[in-house]
Design a protein with these regions (language model features):
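Membrane-proximal basic amphipathic "stem/tether" segments
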Residues: 1-37, 242
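S-adenosylmethionine/decaboxylated-SAM
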Residues: 27-36, 46, 50-243
Length: 243
């Protein structure tokens, strides 16, 4: 019991430290958006989004790996519009959730995993159609590995709205919020690095110090990477490519 309590106290202390150090720029629009748009977003990411978009090196596309119901997608678009940027936004998510392989139903409910996936996808489409209509993102229903293969091959593909787009070329920013295991996060970084232009930025979700996810291990490696510089931890890591 004592070990369990000690562990809980340590986790609480880590949470308090992250909260105290976090720069939060939530405004009225973000508050209303978060009421209606489901999502799991650390408020510290808002400042990182805003900072990255204000310092985009060009008008080349920005990418989002992992979109869920579109909360971060809509927030990124909000900051793009607010800063007068017109970068094309391209996102990918196949909506394959942890635990879906364990059974047909969500826990002890009568809701099927397939129904849940369809609901989340429909919610994403509805959310970005309303809140990002002035710069509607191109979304690919593929995994990040599949997406970067399409990008590498410079494929012309149709997004979930049926619009054609030619993939490929350099990008100016990537928000990595896909599978948080070390291997997946590492691969997402390596794929992003191939196309990120000099001065481009990468933000890793749930990468804060003490995070239980494997992507936190990757951060320890990236801070030693001479090709990148740490812009800020708030508490998640935002990097800029130096060369």
């Amino acid at each position: 019991m004592e070990d369990r309590n000690t562990s809980r106290i340590k986790m609480l202390c880590q949470f308090i430290k992250r909260t105290i150090r976090t720069i939060d720029i939530t405004d009225e629009y973000i508050e209303w958006l978060c009421f209606a748009n489901a999502g799991m977003l650390h408020k510290g990411n808002l400042y990182c989004f805003d900072l990255a978009i204000k310092h985009l090196p060009s008008n080349k596309p920005i990418l989002e790996v992992g979109s869920f119901c579109g909360l971060s997608t809509n927030i990124l678009n909000y900051y793009l519009k607010r800063t007068g940027r017109n970068n094309k936004m391209i996102t990918c998510d196949k909506w394959i959730f942890e635990g879906s392989e364990k059974g047909r139903y969500l826990g002890n409910s009568d809701v099927l995993h397939s129904e849940y996936k369809a609901f989340v996808k429909e919610t994403f489409v509805r959310n970005i159609s309303v809140f990002s209509r002035s710069n509607l993102p191109y979304h690919m229903e593929v995994t990040s590995d599949e997406f970067f293969k399409l990008w590498s091959d410079k494929k012309v593909v149709a997004d979930i709205f049926g619009r054609e787009i030619e993939l490929g070329g350099e990008i100016s920013f990537c928000y990595i919020d896909g599978n948080h295991t070390y291997d997946f996060a590492r691969r997402d970084f390596e794929n992003t690095d191939r196309y990120l232009e000099k001065g481009g930025l990468i933000l890793f979700d749930d990468s804060y110090d003490g995070s239980p996810f494997g992507c936190a291990r990757l951060m320890k490696e990236l801070v030693r990477n001479r090709d990148y510089e740490l812009v800020i931890k708030n508490p998640n890591y935002l990097f800029r490519k130096k060369k």
